[in-house]
């Protein structure tokens, strides 16, 4: 007999060899039905794995984040199973979980399009209803290679060859087998709420030199109600797509001559300036001086900083006069060079620097997505050099600044997470222990609740992440605060302590809106293009009922502009109804409509974008009304 301890502290006795599913059944049939896997002594295991010794057990159900992830991963396998049934000559590659769903990449021998997704989905439902048990076997690497070679799965063979482990897991459901670490669901019958959403191209291993594969995306949920809610959200998200709205509002465009880099139009630049000017004022308030550093630096700098060894595949490189250079993927190393131009005392610290720095990252073409995933972007970076004793106070200030910024931009619902050390990192464990604890202490001191994300930190230090929830419930990872003991040391940053000794400062990396491009894309989707007055590229459109009011329209337009209002003058010889509809579609917050009566009385009639009639007032009163809204960030 063995003893199993549960999360509530209770201990129960079971026969050796019992599995988590059996344990769940002994508690209740409904719990067994919902059980996806289990943590056995903090190791995530399949629900049917045998338990042979005393342990601590935590059952994972569809209500747990891990359970939903397992459900989605298993649904990816179901997708591959269905594809192999329908298109037997297809080679399968990889099928990971992504936000809200999964995808699987295939090498089809025939042409596949969006129109084929319903057929594949129908086959998935047929296979799920078979209630096929899901099991796995562990085999030597050589045996796994032979197994997949015999099936003509060359991509699987390549994957196995690249794995250092000598033992491989092969999962099987019905007549389909796939290579996977697991865990997976006990039975396919639990897969009831899923849908295939789209199809795209993707290079094998993200390398454009390799074969183009077909990527099929899907979503999977614990219940049909959850699925329906998500699909409704997707429909709303489609309406809010910043790429579509950006085209309507004439904000920006992309073209193949410069993939992943936006061409900003006048209206887009107006929004950009508001965001940048706001952040500049916020940085001034929090004591940051502004710097500007080079886009290109000798490759030796990136070797010293650690980027060359940890980030080289994402960097653009160039040569000049027999020297190797790299276009910066991050702003931090060049910022350290500004710090290093002077000798610093401990009395000078903290030193806070801010930069709207343009960076370039060689993102795979298949991952590019409008403003949300680009190859060149401007980061609102801040770098603080301080003593270890000052870290917590500085982090508290930065958290406070983040809260203020997000609320002013209309994001009132956000979560904070701490991303802990990744496997691929620089620095020793003692330094990482100290770094992670400092961030926790700073948030604890500020009474801020947070979630821990093991393995998600940057290669040079742990980070605090701010995840913003938008108007339709989507979560966006936005600002970061990163603690770095390594880079200042690698790049020779020092200060003189109170004993006259040289010390290495702690470096805090901070981005609040992050990529300005991405943040503007978020704002467009959050507000569905109806930006608040202070951000709107055009705040007021002035138009006359007939051309008889042209002179008065010009007079009102000039008065608005003199008061700092971003106005547009519409003197076209069109019907007033047409003008109103057009400027409404362009999301202009206020329309000023001028007729004979307004001209004679020197007043204006105002209509909101929503259609609400605000009546008549003087231009001065209207400007005061607008200014009040702008100052309040409404």
UniProtKB/Swiss-Prot annotation:
UniProt keyword Zinc, yes or no: yes
Gene3D superfamilies reported for this sequence: 3.10.20.30, 3.30.54.20, Anticodon-binding domain (3.40.50.800), Bira Bifunctional Protein, Domain 2 (3.30.930.10), Threonyl-trna Synthetase, Chain A, domain 2 (3.30.980.10)
Organism: Francisella tularensis subsp. tularensis (strain WY96-3418)
Protein encoded by which gene: thrS
Gene Ontology, cellular component aspect: cytoplasm
Cofactor note as given: Binds 1 zinc ion per subunit.
Protein name: Threonine--tRNA ligase
Superkingdom: Bacteria
GO biological process, any: threonyl-tRNA aminoacylation
One MF annotation (Gene Ontology) recorded for this entry: metal ion binding
Cofactor(s) essential for the protein: Zn(2+)
Catalytic as annotated region, ranges: 241-532
Residues annotated as binding Zn(2+): 332, 383, 509
Record domain TGS: where: 1-61
Catalysed conversion reaction: tRNA(Thr) + L-threonine + ATP = L-threonyl-tRNA(Thr) + AMP + diphosphate + H(+)
Listed EC numbers: 6.1.1.3
Task performed by this protein: Catalyzes the attachment of threonine to tRNA(Thr) in a two-step reaction: L-threonine is first activated by ATP to form Thr-AMP and then transferred to the acceptor end of tRNA(Thr). Also edits incorrectly charged L-seryl-tRNA(Thr).
Keywords: Aminoacyl-tRNA synthetase, ATP-binding, Cytoplasm, Ligase, Metal-binding, Nucleotide-binding, Protein biosynthesis, RNA-binding, tRNA-binding, Zinc
Subcellular location: Cytoplasm
Subunit organization: Homodimer.
Similarity annotation: Belongs to the class-II aminoacyl-tRNA synthetase family.
CDD domains: TGS_ThrRS, ThrRS_anticodon, ThrRS_core
